[in-house]
Every structure is written in C-alpha cells, then in structure tokens.
From Swiss-Prot:
Signal peptide residue numbers: none
Keywords: Ribonucleoprotein, Ribosomal protein
A cellular component term, taken from the record's GO annotations: ribosome
Record family assignment: Belongs to the universal ribosomal protein uS10 family.
Described purpose of this protein according to its UniProt entry: Involved in the binding of tRNA to the ribosomes.
SUPFAM superfamilies registered for this protein in UniProt: Ribosomal protein S10
Protein name: Small ribosomal subunit protein uS10
Superkingdom of the source species: Bacteria
Cross-referenced Gene3D superfamilies: Ribosomal protein S10 domain (3.30.70.600)
GO molecular function: structural constituent of ribosome; tRNA binding
Quaternary state and interactors: Part of the 30S ribosomal subunit.
Keyword Ribonucleoprotein in annotation: yes
Record HAMAP family: Ribosomal_uS10
Lineage: Bacteria, Bacillati, Bacillota, Bacilli, Bacillales
Length: 102
C-alpha cells in the first residue's frame, strides 16, 4: 500500500507569524499520531519596487521598497483521520496563506 502524505505550504510576509503557525501545525500533527517532516524553510521571495520621489522631475532621487514573502513546507506522512480533524479545527493567524495538497 502506498504511503499517504499531506503537504502543507505556508506563505506570509512576517517570519515570526509563519514560524508560530508552523509550530502549531507540527505540534497538532504529532499529538494525533502522524509522522511529521518539517517545517522546511523554502527560499524567500524578495520583490523590490523603485519609484521616483518627486512627481515631475528629479529622476536621480528615487526610493526603493521591498516586500519579502517567507515560505515553509511541512509534510505529514501517514495521517490518521484524527490528524485531519485536528488540522481542520486549527485556528491560525490571518496573515498566513495555507495551501494543502493530499
């Protein structure tokens, strides 16, 4: 029989929030009796935006903004029905994007 696996990808702009969420997920999965691999930190996406400070002229005066997207990967191997129920009832912060693949 093939092993079942749940793959959870987390994305957030704040690394503290994503680490707390990952720890909650890992703790919940381990408590329910599943094997957990992770959280694995994936490369951080960095988007840099450059704008001109003045409205009409002074092209040499520019300002740069950046937006970092932190990502984590968690694999849950051999999940039990209890694991799935516990993960569905888990409350996570609103700043975390969760993508689950079975």
């Amino acid at each position: 029989m093939a092993k079942q696996k749940i793959r959870i990808r987390l994305k957030a702009y704040d690394h503290r929030v994503i680490d707390q969420s990952a720890e909650k997920i890992v703790e919940t999965a381990k408590r329910s009796g599943a094997d957990v691999s992770g959280p694995i930190p994936l490369p951080t996406e960095k988007s840099v935006y450059t704008i001109i400070r003045a409205v009409h002229m002074y092209k040499d005066s520019r300002e740069q903004f950046e937006q970092r997207t932190h990502k984590r990967l968690i694999d849950i191997v051999n999940p039990t029905p209890k694991t799935v129920d516990a993960l569905m009832g888990l409350n996570l912060p609103s700043g975390v994007d969760i993508e689950i693949k079975l």
